[in-house]
């Protein structure tokens, strides 16, 4: 049997994770500032991808800069933005019940979605530090009544200096247990987020590489 191996294309564009690759506990990882600087100076196509839906790209750019990383907000793409792009394509200017922070709320407002507690078409779950029993109960009832269940990302936990933090995946599991409905997850490792990211910078999959640290999100999708 003859196996023909296709020659790999030259990598000219990059997608990179943020936490654990460029950034850890409020500081740039050694070598990351130099890499970003090199890419910017060479006008290399790249985009920072993160499943963090709490912050807007503007917020993240400021936070990264405070830790020594100069990443323009235009080169940051979050799971909240990917979720908004997905919903804008599926059902433009529709309605949603949203559990999340400023990053998700801003992204949803920017596509013209109306937030409502009256028969929303979607229940959209993002990462949040302000969960309440009331909001979870409402979400479960809307899902049981027919609202489509969307989650920004599958990560069950996130990092912090004090240990793990509960993240979107854990809350989604709770709602799934309560409703019997699994969410459609937009963020990594969903290939759709990567396709959207590549379109954003005019890149092609054959000449783009993914840099990540998590096998279950970054590496799986990169393959």
Description of each model-found segment:
Residues 15-16, 32, 36-64, 76, ...:
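Substrate-recognition element of Asp-dependent hydrolases with the DxDx(T/V) motif
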Residues 183-220:
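Conserved Lys-Pro-Asp/Glu-containing loop-to-beta segment of HAD-superfamily phosphomonoesterases
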């Amino acid at each position: 049997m003859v196996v023909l191996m296709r020659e790999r294309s030259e990598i000219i564009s990059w997608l990179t994770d943020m936490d654990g690759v460029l950034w850890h506990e409020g500081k740039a990882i050694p070598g990351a500032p130099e890499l970003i600087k090199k890419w910017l100076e060479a006008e290399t196509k790249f985009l920072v991808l993160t499943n963090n839906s709490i912050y807007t790209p503007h917020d993240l750019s400021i936070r990264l800069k405070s830790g020594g990383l100069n990443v323009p907000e235009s080169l940051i793409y979050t799971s909240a933005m990917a979720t908004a792009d997905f919903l804008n394509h599926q059902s433009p200017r529709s309605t949603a019940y949203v559990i999340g922070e400023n990053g998700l709320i801003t992204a949803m407002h920017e596509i013209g979605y109306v937030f409502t507690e009256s028969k929303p078409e979607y229940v959209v779950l993002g990462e949040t530090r302000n969960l309440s029993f009331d909001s979870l109960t409402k979400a479960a009832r809307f899902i049981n009544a027919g609202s489509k269940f969307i989650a920004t990302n599958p990560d069950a936990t996130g990092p912090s200096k004090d240990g793990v933090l509960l993240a979107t995946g854990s809350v989604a599991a709770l709602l799934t247990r309560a409703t019997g409905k699994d969410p459609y997850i937009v963020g990594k490792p969903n290939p759709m987020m990567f396709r959207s990211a590549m379109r954003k910078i005019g890149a092609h999959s054959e000449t783009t590489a993914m840099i990540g640290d998590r096998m279950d999100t970054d590496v799986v999708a990169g393959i």
